[in-house]
Amino acid sequence: STQLWRQEGKLMNHWTTPVCKDGYLYGLYGHGKSDSAPLKCIEIATGKEMWSQDGFGAGGATVLVGGNVLVQSARGPLVLVEASPKAFRELARAQIFGGQCWTMPVVSGGKIFARNTKEGFCLDASSSSSGE
């Protein structure tokens, strides 16, 4: 195998691995940065950082949902982000609980299941629940 690129100390994940869509990685990078760790978009072919948005926290997680990135922030907000290398674009946000959230949310049947260190939560995210 051939190493294509390497960035020491710049793309360090704390708890979770990034998700991949259309040749780009979307993940929380910033081992040791606690609540300030950014969500970044990285071009897989070159390692180039396309954009970075601070404030998600190193302990959060990312999952692909409907072609977008759902981020479980380290302090409770669930944030839906457009999976695009052009720019960071927040599509929706829900503060479901506080405390430390270090687990990956699960999406199934139009529902989002998440938890923190003290409680679990289920959010109905189906289009019928939004009044559409």
PLM regions and their residue ranges:
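Noncatalytic, solvent-exposed loop/strand surfaces
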Residues: 1-132
